[in-house]
Swiss-Prot record:
<keyword id="KW-0479">Metal-binding</keyword>
<dbReference type="InterPro" id="IPR052283">
    <property type="entry name" value="GenomicStab_NeuMorph_Reg"/>
</dbReference>
<dbReference type="GO" id="GO:0005813">
    <property type="term" value="C:centrosome"/>
</dbReference>
<dbReference type="GO" id="GO:0110026">
    <property type="term" value="P:regulation of DNA strand resection involved in replication fork processing"/>
</dbReference>
<feature type="compositionally biased region" description="Basic and acidic residues">
    <location>
        <begin position="362"/>
        <end position="381"/>
    </location>
</feature>
<dbReference type="GO" id="GO:0021687">
    <property type="term" value="P:cerebellar molecular layer morphogenesis"/>
</dbReference>
<keyword id="KW-0206">Cytoskeleton</keyword>
<keyword id="KW-0963">Cytoplasm</keyword>
<feature type="modified residue" description="Phosphoserine">
    <location>
        <position position="16"/>
    </location>
</feature>
<feature type="modified residue" description="Phosphoserine">
    <location>
        <position position="369"/>
    </location>
</feature>
<feature type="coiled-coil region">
    <location>
        <begin position="169"/>
        <end position="296"/>
    </location>
</feature>
<keyword id="KW-0175">Coiled coil</keyword>
<feature type="modified residue" description="Phosphothreonine">
    <location>
        <position position="175"/>
    </location>
</feature>
<dbReference type="GO" id="GO:0140059">
    <property type="term" value="P:dendrite arborization"/>
</dbReference>
<feature type="zinc finger region" description="C2H2-type; degenerate">
    <location>
        <begin position="26"/>
        <end position="51"/>
    </location>
</feature>
<dbReference type="GO" id="GO:0008270">
    <property type="term" value="F:zinc ion binding"/>
</dbReference>
<dbReference type="InterPro" id="IPR057038">
    <property type="entry name" value="FBX41/ZN365_Znf-C2H2"/>
</dbReference>
Amino acid sequence: MQQKAFEESRYPWQESFENVAVCLPFRCPRCGDHTRFRSLSSLRAHLEFSHSYEERTLLTKCSLFPSLKDTDLVTSSELLKPGKLQSSGNVVKQKPSYVNLYSISHEHSKDRKPFEVVAERPVSYVQTYTAMDLRADSLDGPRSGPGLPTSDTKASFEAHVREKFNRMVEAVDRTIEKRIDKLTKELAQKTAELLEVRAAFVQLTQKKQEVQRRERALNRQVDVAVEMIAVLRQRLTESEEELLRKEEEVVTFNHFLEAAAEKEVQGKARLQDFIENLVQRVELAEKQLEYYQSQQASGFGHDLSGHVLTDISSNRKPKCLSRGHPHSVCNHSDLKAHFHPKGRNHLKKAKDDRASMQPAKAIHEQAESSRDLCRPPKKGELLGFGRKGNIRPKMAKKKPTAIVNII
């Protein structure tokens, strides 16, 4: 009956445990080999959500025995012999090899893999457990003897191991939860820092884009300014050339004006001399005409002819002198008086005074003289001119006699 009970205590997952892969040591006893897990927590979560609470007892046996070494299982099988049942509690306390799960999980938590608890040697468990079954079968006879409660000892051992394992799993879970909380806090802190860094990066990117945009705008402004400066320089050069050309034209125009002013002054002087000579001749002609008229009125024609000859000889004095007739001047006392040095000096002074007059005055005099010449003559003047026209033929008739007398 004990052997039958022991065989009934074996689970169906123990028969196919030899084909377990090393990479995924934990499998679901209800689902089979196709559902395997790398960590104990993953298997436990699967059992909690997929199977009933009674199936968790399989998890304790499935995860306990792979962590036990061959020697530990041999010693546990030896504890079933008579005489050693009393010290089984001490042996288990001396060699709690299942506590290695906590150290393994703690080491893996340091390696940033808190969710993976890998069994030490899951394959060796199959061999050890089969050996233990054979030994248990061989020891059925002695254990079935009177006075040896083998079933109670096994049940108490399993309960003790289950309790220890549950406490260990709870401790591991608490440690893992603490570690998860710590890692969650660190992750939240790192996430916040990452968000801050990302916000700063986005802000710096925006600033960089703004700076690049301003740089492009300033580059465009600089290009436009350079083009404007080049255009203004070209315009300045053209303006300078135009100014130089205008200055040359102004200088040329000034020279032309100076030359024209000089010519105008010379022309005015010549015109003034011509007008003065003309006025003198007119005055002389008027005097001669008046004298002739007065002589004609008084009937002294001989005296008139003598005076006319003296006047003509005085007017022709330079020609006579140039021809070399000094005796003609010496024979006439009136001509000597006319060409006296004092008289010549007086005429020179008069000419100098007239030359020193302003151009406006000369122009005014010229205009007045032109007006006098161009104005219509009055009645007396018409008579005078008529008389003058009548006198000229007489004077022309008397000229040969006067010339003969001069010769």
